[in-house]
């Protein structure tokens, strides 16, 4: 399986079968992966193989980069169906996730009010109130839970926190 490390903070657009023309927002460093899981099937590879040297993009860097791309696409009359938070790891792990979502919604409303905002997440951070609040703001809150079998999760998803329990995620 080939490994994909996405540009940061903005990549694409790509054409998604599920979402349409999707502009990606990667809240992780452009040179590596930071994730709360280390899934055997991850397209970004294993955490240990792609430890970043760069820092995560700041809230302001994300806002400026997203505004630039949205303004350019709007000016060129290029379509956009969705702004999707995904990339090199778990987007909700960014310390400014909620504020970045708020900025994104403001920019979307200005340039592409018909576009959706989506988040692809492994659901490991939903226990945080500010993450839950941010996820409630987006149009497509796409949370991934592979199974409720903790043995399978430990073997395949490989949570980075030993205390991880899928039941806690479900109850939140």
Regions found by a protein language model. Name each.
Residues 1-20, 64:
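Auxiliary Fe-S-binding modules of radical SAM enzymes
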Residues 19-60:
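Canonical Radical SAM [4Fe-4S] cluster-binding loop centered on the CxxxCxxC motif
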Residues 32, 90-91:
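Short strand->helix junction
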Residues 42-43, 80-82, 148-153:
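Short, basic/glycine-rich phosphate-binding loops at helix/coil junctions
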Residues 83-88:
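Short glycine-rich or small-residue beta-strand-to-loop segments that form or flank ligand, phosphate
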Residues 92-172:
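Conserved AdoMet/S-adenosylmethionine-binding subsite of the radical SAM
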């Amino acid at each position: 399986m080939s490994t994909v490390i996405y540009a940061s903070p903005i990549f694409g657009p790509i054409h998604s079968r599920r979402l349409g023309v999707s502009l990606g927002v990667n809240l992780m460093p452009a040179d590596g992966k930071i994730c709360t899981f280390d899934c055997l099937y991850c397209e970004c590879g294993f955490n240990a193989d792609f430890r970043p040297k760069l820092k995560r993009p700041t809230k302001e860097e994300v806002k400026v980069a997203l505004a630039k791309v949205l303004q350019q696409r709007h000016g060129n009359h290029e379509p956009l169906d969705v702004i999707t938070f995904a990339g090199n790891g778990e987007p909700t792990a960014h310390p400014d996730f909620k504020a970045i979502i708020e900025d994104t919604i403001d920019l979307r409303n200005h340039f592409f009010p018909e576009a959706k905002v989506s988040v692809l997440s492994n659901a490991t951070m939903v226990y945080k109130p500010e993450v839950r609040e941010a996820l409630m703001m987006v149009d497509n809150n796409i949370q991934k839970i592979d199974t409720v079998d903790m043995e399978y999760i430990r073997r395949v998803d490989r949570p980075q926190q030993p205390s991880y329990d899928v039941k806690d995620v479900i109850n939140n």
